[in-house]
């Protein structure tokens, strides 16, 4: 079978083959990016599966270790861990493959740019033959018309003068027609030669591209095949282990580990009663009046057997009158063990002390007081929220914690001030002044959650002073006030430390985080927001949405691309549903929201919201960066927003801003060039625009395009193509285009033309402004994903739009 070549199949009457082949080459970049996205998605799935298997393996360790089946859980755990490692190895291989695809994509872009320069001559030849074809067709029609006119005059018997004029016109049309035929022949030869070479070049590029893509796919399939072979080996090993785990071996292990001994009870013979022994055996039992309740039952069970010694029955020492003797112990031991503790006497010959015990009955007058106390106790218990069991501390540890608490109270702490060195654009009031914290004591009983950035303990703000001096309006400078969150009462004998000066009124840094409570012990909260009620539980994954918004600012100077100035910035906003606020407030330690920013190689600078977002500056990955949020600060901020707008169904929080590295005019999605021709009576204007898909990660449609051009000089009339609107009050011409993409006419290239009649000319060339936007895409290629559990990403919205997009002549 003979392969169909590009040289043979891309000609046609309209000579559009070059355009089709060129765009096919550009689609190769899209296929490369989509292949990288596919492999990345597969790696994400494998990573999630590996984590789930690891979690399952850990849960197998928590299953019951009692019974004969217990050793089987070790087999399950080992097999599951190996399966998790297999999938984790596949993730590593896929990540290496993604880097290879991205590297190939970068080389592909460079190759396509070089090819574009090489085939520029072919593009000119295509345009030339299209123009000469149109001119030839018109000259042919003119020639036929003149010939027909001459023949008509001859047949109608026109005057010789008219016939002579018609003959002159016919001869002139004939010469023009022949001239265009000759030009067409020369242009056709040049076009065929260049088009043949270019078509072959495009075919070579496509063959190389497909070969490389197939090699990448082969590497992908081999990696998956190797992992599946390893998984098969793990399953075989599991089958063999289960085959070796016989019922006999399980029963034998249980008997060896849990066996109680091989000696069976001996025979007991009847013995005659010895009165002396019987009296001594009865005497200790009469002295058990104040012994422990559990011991009495043991002695009743043992009465059918010979009386064992006192030590084996754990009977306390009694005096001659039958009272239990309280063992001697120091104060700490007494507090630790209460009356259950026993201490050995230094001398067995020492005479024990005697204690007289007196039980006082309840006085009748205290009955009502007792009932009232019981009622108060029931009310108190009803208001208590159960928390997870807290491990007991020894008195030494409690004393140490108390010392630390007193030391912390004496030394107020403050968070370091962090400011961005370079501001991108005007920051939101949320990013106002630097974060400063007031002094706050650390509670000794609370501990920070392991997953939160708070490592010392619960930060409790001091109580609000009776009178707070108000800051001047100049210091606030448009910064929205964030209220101080609710502070738990401080149970301390010492007075609270004074409030440190704040950079802002009610600084959001004074945020309290309560002690770590398990989410499992917190009741589910039913939340209703608007027409669609949402039931959110603390164990459910909470939905959040993320918006990536980028702004491209550009200044074009004439038609010189080297004078173009470009600046691209971006914002990341997280949207929380209104129902999540009750979940946060009902759980003192909500799950930390962590997110990862990917594809950051093109970013020059990232500025997180220092009051709400933390990051690790030591991260070494140049293409990703992880962030996590201060959940207490987020809760306070969301509560503030809900108070300002209670009816809102969701609340937006700006988390970070970034700046994208630009490459001049190549980073602008719409290239501009303006031309002015000004005279005393008229002004001619032309604006050339060109769609630039190379500025975007994936070419997308530019919509809502608006062009505004101010023209002075007293405009009396305007003629424009395409039609524009003239605003006489503002002295501006206004164009509005529906959309531009690479599928538009001429690949998204075009011109705006206008002619203005003036009464007070000449005009002065002015700066024009352009606006447009694009949904579902970004210029930087930045992407975001959630890391960890507790939250799910319900929506990711991407868009970019113009900021200050200006052009001068």
Curated annotation (Swiss-Prot):
- A Pfam family it matches: muHD
Q: Where is the MHD domain?
A: 541-808
Modified residues annotated as Phosphoserine in this record: 312, 387, 394, 402-403, 487, 492, 495, 507, 509-510, 532
Q: Superkingdom, according to UniProt?
A: Eukaryota
What processes does the entry annotate via GO biological process terms? clathrin coat assembly; clathrin-dependent endocytosis; membrane invagination; protein localization to plasma membrane; synaptic vesicle endocytosis
Please list where the region (Mediates interaction with DAB2, EPS15, EPS15R and ITSN1) is annotated.
Answer: 520-809
Q: Which residues form a coiled coil?
A: 87-156
In which broad location class does this protein mainly occur, judging by the first location in its UniProt entry? membrane
Positions modified as Phosphothreonine? 385
Instruction: Supply the Gene3D superfamilies for this chain.
Output: Arfaptin homology (AH) domain/BAR domain (1.20.1270.60)
Q: Where is this cross-link: Glycyl lysine isopeptide (Lys-Gly) (interchain with G-Cter in SUMO2)?
A: 297
Polar residues biased stretches: 390-416
What does the entry report about post-translational modification of this chain? Ubiquitinated. Mainly undergoes monoubiquitination but also polyubiquitination.
Give positions of region: Mediates dimerization and binding to membranes enriched in Pi(4,5)-P2 and induces their tubulation: 3-274
Compositional bias ranges of the Low complexity kind: 435-456, 501-520
Give the UniProt entry's GO cellular component terms: clathrin-coated pit; clathrin-coated vesicle; cytoplasm; plasma membrane; presynapse; synapse
Q: Which UniProt keywords apply?
A: Coated pit, Coiled coil, Disulfide bond, Endocytosis, Isopeptide bond, Membrane, Phosphoprotein, Ubl conjugation
Q: What tissue expression does the UniProt record report for this protein?
A: Ubiquitously expressed (at protein level).
Its annotated function is as follows: Functions in an early step of clathrin-mediated endocytosis. Has both a membrane binding/bending activity and the ability to recruit proteins essential to the formation of functional clathrin-coated pits. Has a lipid-binding activity with a preference for membranes enriched in phosphatidylserine and phosphoinositides (Pi(4,5) biphosphate) like the plasma membrane. Its membrane-bending activity might be important for the subsequent action of clathrin and adaptors in the formation of clathrin-coated vesicles.
Q: Which family does it belong to?
A: Belongs to the FCHO family.
Name of protein: F-BAR domain only protein 2
Q: Origin organism of this chain?
A: Rattus norvegicus (Rat)
**Top-level taxonomy:** Eukaryota, Metazoa, Chordata, Craniata, Vertebrata
Gene transcribed to yield this protein: Fcho2
